[in-house]
Amino acid sequence: MEEHYYVSIDIGSSSVKTIVGEKFHNGINVIGTGQTYTSGIKNGLIDDFDIARQAIKDTIKKASIASGVDIKDVFLKLPIIGTEVYDESNEIEFYEDTEIDGTHIESVLEGIRDKNDVPETEVINVFPIRFVVDKDNEVSDPKELIARHSLKVDAGVIAIQKSILINMIKCVEACGVDVLDVYSDAYNYGSILTPTEKELGACVIDIGEDLTQVAFYERGELVDAESIEMAGRDITDDIAQGLNTTYDTAEKVKHQYGHAFYDSASDQDVFSVDQVDSDEHVQYTQKDLSDFIEQRVEDIFFEVFDVLQELGLTKVNGGFVVTGGSANLLGVKELLQDMVSEKVRIHTPSQMGIRKPEFSSAISTISSSIAFDELLDYVTISYQDNEEFEEEVIESDKDSETKSSGFDWFKRKSNKKENDEVAPEAPREESYEDRENHLEDEQQTEGKAKEESKFKKLMKSLFE
């Protein structure tokens, strides 16, 4: 069977992560990962281009080796920095009865990008909230419906500062891969929430190394998002200062003995640390350590509450979902639960090989990619083994000894319907295999042009 892969890159402040995954029934099967720690990123942005580029290149190589996939194309996640979230509508008209397909959906969504009037920003994600066919038929997915007059979309829009977008893409593509599309964490976090949480109103709190990102969802859709420049590094700084030790020692102690909820911390777990101004070793307990950690984590949560108030959000009926690298700390859930009356949970990805909160953003980027590919008819995946089914898209590739990235294939699939309509009927004397090879080549060329043109159009607009 021809494998179809998605590759995501998460450029975080402490490390760069790459995941190679494939759609599997209702979830994602992770087949390879890479992670490289780096000092080239600060507050989620490129701080040292060369160091960051090398880290990205290394993690792509690790993921490629682990998965056996020749990685050529990637989906890039972007942090919630310099980000605007707002609603917009657009409508396209039809002058005859038209069966709606992915190209019409893409057209009505792309029209929203052109309406962006926020200076020095670029629209990176447009996600449909509802579609309206012929003025009064409200639907969630209009594909295959007949429209006589119009297709309208009410959508959420995420825009980011152009300079952030340009530099992120430039750094990734300097590693020899192409960025197929970008997805903001503001949108990605929707995939880690349950339908009930998204409907009632839930707040995602991603505590990373330099940034704590906050996204609020209600009635199934993203409402707003913001970031706070206070996170795991501040916790480590407090420990280093409180224990009078080095940052590196404080980081090790945090991971080995850290506890964010003082009441649950142990006074039996004892450890010793070197002092920065002497040769002596001083002993501390987990409870001593927790005193510093709890105060800083509490401050982070208070900052989150302030953000929610500034956004005009006073109720979080769906609860709080905490993720990110610092969610690994013991006691984080208990501390937040002690501060709020709503439900609190820690989110950890369920896939084998990435069962750590710090991988939430990277795997969510793949979820976002799959969702848009299916919405726009770029891919259609089912699980029938019979070749007679049009939607069976994972096909045998017995001649290939190495795995391809899969992106060439799904770019072909994006134009399959269009090619089927316009391609002339093959002569009867032409073999079935010849026809298949000819059609595949044609689809690959046209599909690739379509996918690339979408992103090239975006990149061109950045430099205008």
UniProtKB/Swiss-Prot annotation:
Topology class, membrane: Peripheral membrane protein
GO cellular component: cell division site; cytoplasmic side of plasma membrane
Main location: membrane
Superkingdom of origin: Bacteria
InterPro entries documented for this protein: ATPase_NBD, Cell_div_FtsA, FtsA/MreB, SHS2_FtsA
Keywords: Cell cycle, Cell division, Cell membrane, Membrane
Pfam families: FtsA, SHS2_FTSA
Gene3D superfamilies, A to Z: 3.30.1490.110, 3.30.420.40
Basic and acidic residues bias: start-end ranges: 416-455
Region spans: Disordered: 392-464
Annotated SUPFAM superfamilies: Actin-like ATPase domain (SSF53067)
Location in the cell: Cell membrane
GO BP term, pick one: FtsZ-dependent cytokinesis
Transmembrane segments: none
Keyword check for Cell membrane: yes
Job description of the protein: Cell division protein that is involved in the assembly of the Z ring. May serve as a membrane anchor for the Z ring.
UniProt xrefs under PANTHER family: CELL DIVISION PROTEIN FTSA, CELL DIVISION PROTEIN FTSA-RELATED
Family classification: Belongs to the FtsA/MreB family.
Subunit and partners: Self-interacts. Interacts with FtsZ.
Protein name: Cell division protein FtsA
